[in-house]
Amino acid sequence: MRTVSMAALVVIAAALAWTSSAEPAPAPAPGEEACGKVVQDIMPCLHFVKGEEKEPSKECCSGTKKLSEEVKTTEQKREACKCIVRATKGISGIKNELVAEVPKKCDIKTTLPPITADFDCSKIQSTIFRGYY
């Protein structure tokens, strides 16, 4: 059960990571190890995005903000997206409307794409997510 919960959080983290308006020097693309780090950073968001809490916790906000500052390049965004797609297959209970609320409630400047297990990661563009299609 812990694996499913952790995988669900990858959805939030990777989506929030695509917030940069500029392309910094490339860093290693998120792989399996990075997906684990993403999960660790945003684990506190699970209760909020499943509708079990009215507000995201302080830990949820700090973890998602940290992640949004780390994943910047198009390749990093696409790799994180692939991680989300793998992690969300078969997971239920995540409410997309609440995922979209995390940045607003945490005062993180971003626009999020749809968070689904079949999202086409190749649609992710280079800057902010408003241009992901």
Curated annotation (Swiss-Prot):
Q: Specify the superkingdom.
A: Eukaryota
InterPro entries recorded for this chain?
Answer: Bifun_inhib/LTP/seed_sf, Bifunc_inhib/LTP/seed_store, Plant_nsLTP
Q: Does the keyword Cytoplasm apply?
A: no
Going by the UniProt record, its keywords in alphabetical order are: Allergen, Disulfide bond, Lipid-binding, Signal, Transport
Q: Which cysteines are joined by disulfide bonds?
A: 35-83, 45-60, 61-106, 81-121
- Report the Pfam families cross-referenced here: Tryp_alpha_amyl
SUPFAM superfamilies with a match to the protein in the record? Bifunctional inhibitor/lipid-transfer protein/seed storage 2S albumin
Gene Ontology annotations of biological process type = lipid transport
Query: CDD domains of this UniProt entry?
Result: nsLTP1
Q: Per its record, what are the GO molecular function terms? A: lipid binding
Residues in the signal sequence: 1-31
What does the record give as the function of this protein?
Plant non-specific lipid-transfer proteins transfer phospholipids as well as galactolipids across membranes. May play a role in wax or cutin deposition in the cell walls of expanding epidermal cells and certain secretory tissues.
Q: Which family does it belong to?
A: Belongs to the plant LTP family.
This protein is called: Probable non-specific lipid-transfer protein 2
Q: What is the lineage of its organism?
A: Eukaryota, Viridiplantae, Streptophyta, Embryophyta, Tracheophyta
